[in-house]
């Protein structure tokens, strides 16, 4: 891969993808049960063996298109292997954030994690720790009163969706305050990567950090060009965080001078903006429309002389707003062409959540055959991946990937 001056270089949604972050599906999926899956934001239980096969097809398409893949577990391992003191700090922080409250259990977990190889320790932190795995473990009164029984540390099945815990914007990142409690521990990995990894430490500005008051998730963060962002206000991202991100980007004198905030319904089906809206070519977007799907659009700009943000509400249609701020006519391909039945089915299965690997070239779930055919009829090259198991977590190819480097366009 050609060298870039910065380890993060994302100034578009569609520039040729050069480097991306993924997570291989692991034993955390095997620890989902019918009784807890809803709490962990899954609508069904994936079959791990097939999920891995499907994910490998995804990774193979990326590799065949000369995309360098980083795996989040490998980056964390590269951080921790450098220092025993850092390993101990990471273990202690992880246990603290898992809300383990008794000294006895804390010490058992420290001993347990320290006894594993670094790679196995990271895998176990993601997959969760059950009571039988800790020798001499006994439930405390606090455990019994608060219903702790099966897991001492809960699994993190949503690590599969690397898009959300942090997001690349320009040459920096947001390390996000996740909306749901079950996902908040995921961002500890990003914290350590950007603080301690030799490639990323001191080289990547942090626009927002994981301890912010308001939530922000990467599925709501879209980079359209060097001056323009689109941020979703959704079920998972709050308006406060959008404004705070704008302040950070503007005051740090980045190239971004305009943010379009798209407010969408707070609905499980539309949890992030990228579940209903993504860019797939220079002037082509895909979107989902239904009776309850609407976009309220706000524009945030900065006045350097007064150091104030100006916010206004746009009254024009989304197509006209995008055309104005991009300076060219744009087209929107609707999920299944707007068909009420196929459109709803295919949006639910991430028909709009596609990953652009180059202008006019995307990776999509094969099951969304009506939408995929429309893409191809409109000149878009579609790489299809199987998704009978991956789709059970309500995330598509864009959700399962965090671009680190794209070619500028």
Curated annotation (Swiss-Prot):
Reaction(s) catalysed by this chain's protein: L-arginine + H2O = L-citrulline + NH4(+)
Gene Ontology MF: a single term: arginine deiminase activity
A GO cellular component entry from the record: cytoplasm
Name of the protein in question: Arginine deiminase
Enzyme Commission (EC) number: 3.5.3.6
Record bears the keyword Hydrolase: yes
Gene behind this protein: arcA
HAMAP family (UniProt xref): Arg_deiminase
Pfam families per UniProt: ADI
